[in-house]
């Protein structure tokens, strides 16, 4: 694996870029834009969803940036970040060469997942290029209801003040359902949601069959990171210190055009417990099994038009 730091020429903003070692000329890669959640940064997200551990094995290129806005908590905002994210993706595509990008995925934790949905629903650039969306507790197409006590430990006054501040800035507003075509994988911790729906409107859209439970993914090693601010008073929904774990995997088979639609639930886990090695790899396997080609098709069409 090779790790580089991308520096945006306009803003000076930095981004982690993880690439596979020994890329051969013309070798295909899967490109992942990995977005952190509210109150987080790129460094934390890179450890929470450590796709970099698998860039060599699955020939991934993973870009993990940080949002610009810091108040009331660091978060992605359209006016502060969308142009930057487009420029970031363009810089990576220029570096790689568009013809070698087999697939392009958005991955986002929490508000980063909500931002992924907003980009897919409201930004032609991403709708036209993204082949898939991995929502890491960032919302489900066909919602999974949040647990009633979801969130970090706060007094009622603290919770109310935070909700009012975020509402004023539209930080956690859910975007419309995208109309673009893409594969969709939802992953959540058991304690974050009341229950996982047993149907999926996204699967129905692609004519996929009823969900099939796959073999559980069992990890004997913990994740790399968690929200240590609340170690003295953790909640199940927000998450505790990382531990080994088991995840249930559900796949909706035979979606049109090979689209991958899947749900993954980590048992006895909350919102901020970093992903364990095996469940991380399982998510990546699902991603690379999905069809791609949008970036390549746009590049080809542009070349023909030119």
Protein language model features and the residues they cover:
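Short substrate-entry loop that stabilizes the transition state in hydrolases
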Residues: 23-74, 142-143, 272-273
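A domain-start/cap signature at the N-terminus of enzymes
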Residues: 1-31, 61, 77-80, 100-125, ...
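Post-His helix in hydrolase/transferase enzymes
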Residues: 275-281
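Acidic catalytic loop of the alpha/beta-hydrolase fold
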Residues: 190-194, 271-273
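Short glycine-rich catalytic loops that host catalytic nucleophiles or stabilize transition states
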Residues: 264-269
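Alpha/beta-hydrolase active-site loop
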Residues: 75-97
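Short beta-strand/loop motif that positions the catalytic acidic residue
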Residues: 185-188
